[in-house]
């Protein structure tokens, strides 16, 4: 049997909120935007959750350099990779279309009652 408490995920990726990079507000805003984009693209919740995990891991791995990256471009890349990983692929051109169409979209999730 596998033990979560001895896994690499638990040892390496579970960190306190204070350990997140300085651009935490951008990380939160990007996460909300990814949820909106994933709902608009009719992606499964598991794909969106995997994309958020990938985004957080990228932010932790990049450390203080998080501010140098375009958060929404990284978010779209995480959604694309998560869709591939969860075997729910969508072509990259469709993600780009959704992202450009909803670039200025607010973070209200009231319409997303899927």
Kindly label every feature range from the protein language model.
Residues 1-17:
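An acidic, Gly/Ser/Thr/Pro-rich helix-cap/linker signature
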């Amino acid at each position: 049997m596998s033990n979560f408490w001895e896994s690499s995920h638990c040892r390496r990726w579970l960190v306190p909120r204070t350990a997140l990079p300085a651009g935490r507000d951008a990380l939160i805003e990007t996460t909300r935007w990814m949820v909106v984009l994933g709902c608009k693209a009719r992606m499964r919740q598991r794909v969106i959750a995997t994309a958020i995990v990938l985004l957080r891991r990228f932010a932790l791995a990049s450390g203080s350099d998080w501010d140098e990256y375009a958060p929404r471009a990284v978010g779209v890349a995480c959604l694309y990779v998560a869709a591939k990983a969860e075997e729910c692929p969508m072509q990259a051109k469709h993600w780009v279309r959704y992202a450009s169409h909803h670039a200025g979209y607010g973070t209200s999730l009231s319409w997303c009652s899927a």
